[in-house]
A protein has these predicted regions:
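Conserved beta-strand hairpin/beta-sheet module of binuclear metal-dependent hydrolase folds
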Residues: 1-45, 127-137
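Core dinuclear metal-dependent hydrolase active-site scaffold
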Residues: 18, 104-129
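Short Gly/Pro-enriched turn/cap motifs at secondary-structure boundaries
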Residues: 7-9, 97, 117-119
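Active-site HxH/HxHxD metal-binding segment of metal-dependent hydrolases
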Residues: 11, 33-111, 194-195
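Metallo-beta-lactamase
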Residues: 91, 117, 122-201
């Protein structure tokens, strides 16, 4: 497995992640950069995009999805609640091809992603863990958490979601890769993030 960190377009510079499996299949976590940036990275790796996994439906995480789906025919996964229409940039049903598996596990080649439903920033937000990594979208940030004042947001649900993440059976060394800003570890967030224990709500 190889993973590349690719920034989305200005001014939000969303963190997106392109994973190349041993079989040269590309898995994209969120899609906020120009489509050509991802296609170039895939070409340089000799890989084909097969899956896009979306942490939630806000425009700054899905901007390249339609173009990439058209170019590659890849599968696109999003929680059905957010799939009803992403904020400011609706994605039509023909683009959003798949819901998360009923058992909340998705295996692609040698990788198995565990899906955690974490509403709060949006009603359909998810976090994904795989191979010692936690892709936390706009739920958990380094030292903070996602906003809850957008349509579909909820402080109460965010508090529950952050408590869920704090109690996950994942080691402290798990690397937290959020949708914006810098990276962290789950142990660091458990011990220092004031939003992780629910006391703020």
């Amino acid at each position: 497995m190889n993973i590349q960190h690719i920034h989305g377009v200005a001014p939000l510079y969303t963190n997106t992640f392109l994973i190349i499996t041993n079989a040269k299949h590309g898995i994209l976590i969120d899609a906020a950069a120009e489509p050509g940036v991802y296609l170039k990275a895939l070409d340089e790796a000799g890989a084909t995009l097969t899956h896009i996994l979306l942490t939630h439906g806000h425009y700054d995480h899905v901007g390249a999805v339609a173009a990439l789906k058209k170019a590659t025919g890849c599968k696109v996964y999003m929680d059905p609640v957010d799939a009803q229409g992403s904020q400011l940039l609706p994605l039509t049903p023909d683009v959003l091809t798949d819901n998360w598996p009923a058992n909340d596990e998705l295996t692609i080649d040698e990788l198995t992603f565990k899906i955690y439903h974490t509403p709060g920033h949006t009603r359909g937000g998810v976090c994904l863990s795989c191979y010692g990594l936690l892709f936390s979208g706009d739920t958990l940030f380094a030292g903070s958490c996602g906003r809850t004042d957008f349509p579909g947001g909820s402080m109460q649900e965010m508090a529950r979601s952050l408590s869920l993440l704090a109690e996950l059976p994942l080691p402290d060394a798990t690397k937290v890769l959020p949708g914006h800003e810098g990276f962290s570890t789950l142990g660091q967030e458990r011990s220092t993030n004031p939003y992780m224990n629910g006391a703020w709500y």
